[in-house]
Each structure stands twice: as C-alpha cells, then as structure tokens.
Amino acid sequence: MLDYDALVDQALQLLEQNINKNYRVCIGIIGPPGSGKSTVAEKLKEKINSRYHDYLAHEHHAEVAVRPLSSAIDLTGDLSVANKELQAEIKAGFYSHVEDNNFKPVQVKESDGSTLIVGRGGLDNAVRIKPLRKEANLSPTKPDIAQIVPMDGFHLSRKHLDHFKDPTVAHLRRGSPFTFDSNNFLQLCKVLSKTCSLDPNYHSTGPETVNEDNTNSLFDNVTNSFIDLPEISFPGFDHAIKDPVADQHTVHKFTRILILEGLYLLLNQENWSLIYDAIASTGAFIFWNIVIDEDVIEQRVAKRHVKSGICLSLEEGIQRFRANDQINGRLIQSQSVRNANKNVKNVYDIRND
C-alpha cells in the first residue's frame, strides 16, 4: 500500500525547497486506467490541506493576509483574440476544429471581465481567468493550499465526438488521446506554469527538509507570502451525464501546490508531448508514475464500467477494458517522454497494488 504520509512529506519538501523562488509547485500523477490516480490525488490534497488547517488552528490565525501583485501578470499574451466570426462559431458549438490537434487556442473577453481560453473542444473545455475582485475581505479562515488539476474535464463532449469523421470509432475509443481537447489542456498547463514561476517576494530562513518538527516553519513562510492572483477555473467531468462541465474546478490565490492528475501527462504524442516541458520550465516539480499489475486494473476498470452503467455485465466490462483501456494503459508506457528524452528528470515510479 502507498504511504500517503510519506508522499505528503515529499510534496511539502518540494514546496519548502522552492519557497523563495516559486509561488507554486507542481506534482504530476500518472498511471494506467484503474491505477487509482484520482484517489491518490484526492488523498494527497486532503492530507496536505488538513496539515495546514491544523497549523492555522494551533497558531490561532483568525485569517491570512494577501498581498497585491507587485506587477501585472500576463497569462494570455501568447494567444490571439477570437474575431467576431470565430466567437459566433464558438457560441454555436464550435465543431469545425474538433479533430485539429494543431488548432491554437484563442481568448475571448467576457462581459464580466473574465477571459475565456477556448480550444478545439469549444466552451465545454474552456479555461476561465477571472478578474481580481475588489472586496475588502478576501481571506477565508481556513484556505486550502493544495488543489487538484484533473485531466478528465478535457474529454471532448459527446456532441463533439459526433462531429468526428468517424464518430463510431470516436465514441468507442473515448478516453483515448485523440478524444481529449489536448490543445486546451496544454494551454492550461502553460498558464499554471506561469503562476508557478512567480517570485513570492518572500525569503524564508527556515530549513529545507520537512519533518514533524519544522513543518510549522514552512507553513509560517507560506502564510506570510500569499499573493492576490486571479482565479483560474477549468472544466471537470460529470460521470452522471458523461460529459465535461465548465468551471467545475478553480485554482485560487491561496493554492501553492498543484496536483495534476491524468493518463497522458507524459505521453510523447501531439500536444501531450509538450506538457512535461511546460511543467519542467517552473523548476519546481515532480511526477509520480503509478505502477500496477494489469490483471488488477482489468478487474477494477471492468467493475467501474458496470457500476457507471456503461456495461451491463462484468464480462462486457472486461471486453471494453481490453478494447480501449488496456490499449491506452500500454500506450503511456511504450510512448512515454521518459523513453524518448534522456533529459527528463524528477519522474519516479510508485506502486499502488
């Protein structure tokens, strides 16, 4: 079994080691279908936030302070603004680029001051950057400092799959690399990387190794270096409706540890192949690759297919696993950026049997 406390210690040590130069750090969790990526990410988030909340309660912090940005941050300067024709197409569903891996996301200015980043999946897979709020009290009593960034929300919607040249194959292979808005997920990674690389403008004097005795020193440094950053919202995936839902997740100003979770974070194909470089550019990252026996995940995924209503029997679930999930799981092993790039670092295998 995984030692979650050890993983939490590693995550906090990554934050401690970079607290002087990076506002945020990135942790990537990858693995085949059924390996428990989501569960690992959720437990990691809960345990990190619980430790921080315990610290706040022990230190009697009524609220935490947030400093303004010392200079403006441009998160979308590399993107074109969608013209009127393109905006009209986006509002109508935006299906013309659904299979275009080379489509470059565009930005759309909203009436509320927010900026939408739209890729080939249209509004269903859009990323929203919200304007800074003007309210006087912006500080909750127990903010979360860890946030999950799941890849699932970038599944192309079923309506978008209907517009593939071969919609039957698109639906059958849903969950495969080409059935995601990889364009916009990559763009989200680039945006988040920019926020990671912000100088927190706070220089700690605490130790760089996290253990039970000095975690408070790290949390002191974190609490004294919050910056008023724009909120970044992105889609999640609703298994009940089997489609992405816009603005389901948010990275807020208090987020200091990003937990990216998904099947293709290290896949060496099309847009996926650029994610590692985007995250590595922060200089403050680690990837955990979940290793697990294939017969274990076959049973897990088959049962999940039955429970979700995708399949009517365990036998049918196993057949679906072998026709799609197994293929995708083997793909991320054979086509990993680790196999193609000797300069890849900070990627470690962990078992989750």
Curated annotation (Swiss-Prot):
InterPro entries: P-loop_NTPase
Coiled-coil intervals: none
Gene Ontology MF terms: ATP binding; kinase activity
EC number from the UniProt entry: 2.7.1.-
Enzyme type, top EC level: transferase
Keyword tags: ATP-binding, Kinase, Nucleotide-binding, Transferase
Residues that, per the record, bind ATP: G31, P32, P33, G34, S35, G36, K37, S38, T39
Function: ATP-dependent kinase that could be involved in endoplasmic reticulum membrane assembly.
Similarity comment text for this entry: Belongs to the YFH7 family.
Protein name, per record: ATP-dependent kinase YFH7
Record gene name: YFH7
